[in-house]
Amino acid sequence: MAELKITLINEDGESTISGKAHPAPTPRILPTPYFMSFTEYKIEGKLWDKKEFHIKSGKIEFNGKEFDIPESQGTWIKDNVEIIIRIFLSQQANKPFSLDF
């Protein structure tokens, strides 16, 4: 697990999730989606009121580096321990984020 922060911007403004994260199983499609599972997380913003959402833009902050998220569609699911974020990119990111923690 690694410390990770995702900032997403949509019609409701800016929303974030940060905490301990690891890659979740991801389908082998292009552009490669981002599936991440968070534990011990903190969420802020209105985006989390919806289970499915449109993303205008965003970024992933990991290990002192930033990775852009282009326009995308997203979903999230939550159980008692973790929240899984799924981001389906509409195009490949200029600087793709590596899910290999």
Swiss-Prot record:
InterPro entries: Dicty_CAD
Any one of the GO BP annotations: culmination involved in sorocarp development
Pfam families: Dicty_CAD
One cellular component (GO) term of this entry: extracellular matrix
Similarity annotation: Belongs to the csb family.
Name of this chain's protein: Contact site B protein C
Organism field: Dictyostelium discoideum
Lineage: Eukaryota, Amoebozoa, Evosea, Eumycetozoa, Dictyostelia
